[in-house]
Amino acid sequence: MTEKKSPVISFKDFSFQYRAQKKPTLTGINLDIYPGEKVLIAGPSGSGKSTLAGCVNGLNPFSNPGECKGTLTVDGVDAPHSSIFELSAHVGTVLQDPDGQFIGLTVGEDIAFALENSCTPQDEMHEITRHAAELVGIENHLDYAPHELSGGQKQRVSLAGVMVDQVKILLFDEPLANLDPAAGKQAIELIDEIQKKTDTTVLIIEHRLEDVLWRNVDRIVLVNEGKILADMTPDELLSTSLLADNGIREPLYVTAMRYAGIDITKEKKPAHVDSVVLDDIDRKKLQDWFEAQPIQEDAGEREKLLEVRNLSFGYTKDHQTLRNVSLSIDK
């Protein structure tokens, strides 16, 4: 008989109220997250999802004063009666604004910041810093300053900086907020790769559901008005109307299936476009719906407002950020 794992994060009848507010932001939270899981916590703006994350890493109530009720244990620690310092040894947090997390003058200094604070010997510090940088693919940028990095690269540095402590839990607070779709996919791929290599527990706080589902997650926890409305697998949640009912845009291919009149069930595996199971009747419905859509006629040649031809640019002579970019934008 397989022994059941104990949760690494456990909320029991938990609520949190900021000192400056009259009502609790979180109420009646019951949630268990197990070692090695990757869990997406989704919800519209103001739903309480970031407050929930702040309770896990200790920002609430130690940096943002407030009152906790119920119990919350994080890797065996009684979180509300602990400290940010103690919880930081268990939870590594990557903020939505990497600039607010950048401390060092260079990438290498920033990654090594926690090691310096713990008086790690120089030789060991260099080795750990190099290993963390290689893990996130930033090892060739250790001498770069913050302003020389893209948003995605800064996020990699932040991730490397929290990984030097070998934490068991990685928390990403809206990691896609400042990234374009392409960089967002790269960020999700990186999170997935790191989780597989290190077997850490990963929490992703995000409302851009389709982008997060670019790689698999074990569960989606839907939060709104400070309460947990759903705790399901992606396939289960996408076969309901809960996302749309609570202001979260479901993946566009799922919306297209609904418009075509397809009955979406968890058996159809709607969590990823490449895994969707459609029978012949479903395919016919989708094709008929697609062919019924009006085709926009070409308006002919338009006045060009912006035109770029073969543009290259680099912050340094040795590294080009843009290479032979050509584009035009019409009026």
Where are these regions (language model features)?
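Catalytic Walker B motif of ABC-type/P-loop ATPase nucleotide-binding domains
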Residues: 170-174
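ABC ATPase C-loop
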Residues: 162-163
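Conserved ABC ATPase signature
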Residues: 145-149, 153
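Conserved ABC ATPase "signature" C-loop
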Residues: 225-226
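Conserved ABC ATPase "signature" region
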Residues: 123-141, 306
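Short helical segment in ABC ATPase nucleotide-binding domains corresponding to the A-loop/adjacent helical element
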Residues: 57, 92, 99, 105-116, ...
